[in-house]
Amino acid sequence: MAHKKAGGSSRNGRDSAGRRLGVKLYGGQSAIAGNIIVRQRGTKFWPGEGVGIGKDHTIFATANGNVTFHKGLKGRTFISVLPAAEAAE
């Protein structure tokens, strides 16, 4: 009789779900205090005016206004939330 030996079990075939990281509000969009602007691992973006940073490096708005991205020292990208009248200038 023909027999097939037991096949070895594979050690692959698993993957974790995506973490939904990235920019949630882009430059020029309006933000309300408490809105999440960026979810990130580490400080790819740094907090500027009107913005706070969480323990997981999430950048969030602390004031109402428009989101702006700008370069700073050491090549860092800062995110600020400026009041609508100030951002228009």
Curated annotation (Swiss-Prot):
SUPFAM superfamilies: Ribosomal L27 protein-like. The keyword Mitochondrion does not apply. One of its GO terms (cellular component) is cytosolic large ribosomal subunit. GO terms for biological process: translation. Keywords: Ribonucleoprotein, Ribosomal protein. One of its GO terms (molecular function) is structural constituent of ribosome. It comes from the Bacteria. The keyword Nuclease does not apply. Pfam families: Ribosomal_L27. InterPro entries: Ribosomal_bL27, Ribosomal_bL27_CS. Belongs to the bacterial ribosomal protein bL27 family. This is Large ribosomal subunit protein bL27. It comes from Ruegeria sp. (strain TM1040).
